Amino acid sequence: MKLLLLALPVLVLLPQVIPAYSGEKKCWNRSGHCRKQCKDGEAVKDTCKNLRACCVPSNEDHRRVPMTSPTPLSDSTPGIIDDILTVRFTTDYFEVSSKKDMVEESEAGRGTETSLPNVHHSS
């Protein structure tokens, strides 16, 4: 008897807590629910049986969009944008030389204008 008294309130409150248990029917391509009043964030899209409203979440677009294939880029005709998007690569060349190479080149160009200094060793 105690078990029956505990189970009775649970069965009475269960439809109010769980919406699917109360038997709300799906509507509007199975994206909405038939309710007496729509909740916040839902919009009325249609009417269900027993004077209930078909409530659909208003933040989603439930229309079916036809699938289209993207247009390949090769079919498009060339235009100004193609000229703008064309990137030309340029490479700059640099010569790298050391100071030793520069001294040797400068001495070769001048010839032997300078003589070696005389070094005197005194003991």
Swiss-Prot record:
Biased composition (Basic and acidic residues): 100-110
Recorded superkingdom: Eukaryota
One of the GO BP terms on file: negative regulation of lipopolysaccharide-mediated signaling pathway
Pro-peptide region(s): 65-123
Keyword entries, A-Z: Antibiotic, Antimicrobial, Cleavage on pair of basic residues, Defensin, Disulfide bond, Secreted, Signal
Biased composition (Polar residues): 112-123
Major localization listed first in the record, in broad terms: secreted
GO CC terms of this entry: extracellular region
Disulfide bonds: 27-54, 34-48, 38-55
Signal peptide: 1-19
Post-translational modification, as annotated: The three-dimensional structure formed by the three intramolecular disulfide bridges is indispensable for antimicrobial activity.
One Gene Ontology molecular-function label: lipopolysaccharide binding
Subcellular compartments: Secreted
Region (Disordered), start-end ranges: 100-123
Protein family: Belongs to the beta-defensin family.
Role, per record: Host defense peptide that exhibits antimicrobial activity against both Gram-negative bacteria, such as E.coli and S.typhimurium, and Gram-positive bacteria, such as S.aureus and B.subtilis. Inhibits cell adhesion of E.coli on intestinal epithelial enterocytes. Causes rapid permeabilization of both the outer and inner membrane of E.coli, leading to morphological alterations on the bacterial surface. Binds to bacterial lipopolysaccharides (LPS) with high affinity, and may thereby be involved in immunoregulation through LPS neutralization.
Protein name: Defensin beta 118
